[in-house]
Each structure stands twice: as structure tokens, then as C-alpha cells.
Design a protein with these regions (language model features):
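Terminal edge beta-strands and adjacent linker/stalk segments
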Residues: 120-124
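Pro/Thr/Ser/Gly-rich low-complexity, intrinsically disordered linker/stalk tracts
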Residues: 21-53, 126-133
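Recognizes extended acidic, P/S/T-rich segments that occur
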Residues: 56-102, 112-119, 135-139
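Position-driven detector of the extreme protein N-terminus
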Residues: 2-3, 15
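Residue-level recognition of well-ordered beta-strand positions that form the cores
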Residues: 46-48, 64, 108
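Hydrophobic h-region of N-terminal signal peptides that target proteins for export
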Residues: 10-19
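Sec-dependent signal peptide recognition
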Residues: 3-10
């Protein structure tokens, strides 16, 4: 009976063990800038992974992009095996054809033990027409 109780306790604790060890995602960037960024084409996204433990490294990531106004997910990379965390291209995203749309994105990463982090906070970018970001006030 004691063995059965320990076994059940172990099974209940398993989901807690699968979480990555105190990994946090910070400094979300779009074209190497933080905050709401205006982009004319496919944005390149980035982030910084932080962990209090030495030797922790990113082995994979997943990016999700949603429309800010509806919350509808318009692009998700799925789990991508990569240690890259800067200037990640979104050139495969077919949603990026609507000018003046605000998009929200977030990311999560996997560590060397294949445990996922929590999703990052959300960051924004806005798609603008070609040449708009270099426009000047004529008044």
C-alpha cells in the first residue's frame, strides 16, 4: 500500500518536473528594437533567455504571432530546433500583407533537458506600407 501511495505521489509531481528550470525570457526585440516597432516587411524577432543556473542553454524555440485587435493566431512556428535567439526571420508568415495592422508576439524556449519555459510576455510590432517609416512631416 505504501508503494502505491509513493507511486501516485510521483505521478502527480511529474508535470512539475517537466518545466524548464527557472528560465525567463526577456528583452523581446523586433529588428533589434524594443517596444512597438514599425516594420515595412517581414520582421526579424529576438529575445534573451535568462536562468540562474550555469550551463543552461536554449535548444529550441516556438514563436506565436496574433492579431492585436482580434487575438487570432496568424502564425506559429511550432517547435524549432535551434539555439538562435536573435534576428529570427518571419519570411514564411503569409499574414504579413495587411498594412497598419498591429501584431502581438510571444516566444517560449526549450533547454538542454528538453523542458519548455513559460511563454514570454507579449511584444508588439506594426506593419506599415513600403517607404512609410522614412516619411517626413510636410507641415
Amino acid at each position: 500500500m505504501m508503494f502505491l501511495k509513493r507511486y501516485i505521489f510521483f505521478l502527480l509531481c511529474m508535470p512539475c518536473l517537466a518545466q524548464a528550470k527557472n528560465i525567463t525570457i526577456s528583452r523581446l526585440t523586433c529588428e533589434m528594437q524594443e517596444g512597438l516597432v514599425l516594420v515595412e516587411a517581414y520582421p526579424r524577432l529576438g529575445w534573451t533567455m535568462e536562468s540562474p543556473e550555469n550551463g543552461t542553454r536554449q535548444t529550441a524555440y516556438e514563436i506565436e504571432i496574433r492579431e492585436a485587435c482580434t487575438g487570432r493566431t496568424v502564425w506559429n512556428t511550432g517547435k524549432v530546433q535551434s539555439s538562435q535567439s536573435q534576428l529570427i526571420p518571419t519570411h514564411g508568415a503569409k499574414f504579413l500583407r495587411f498594412s497598419f495592422y498591429n501584431y502581438i508576439w510571444r516566444v517560449r524556449v526549450w533547454d538542454e533537458t528538453d523542458a519548455p519555459s513559460e511563454w514570454s510576455r507579449e511584444a508588439k510590432f506594426r506593419l506599415v506600407p513600403q517607404g512609410f517609416s522614412s516619411a517626413e512631416w510636410i507641415g
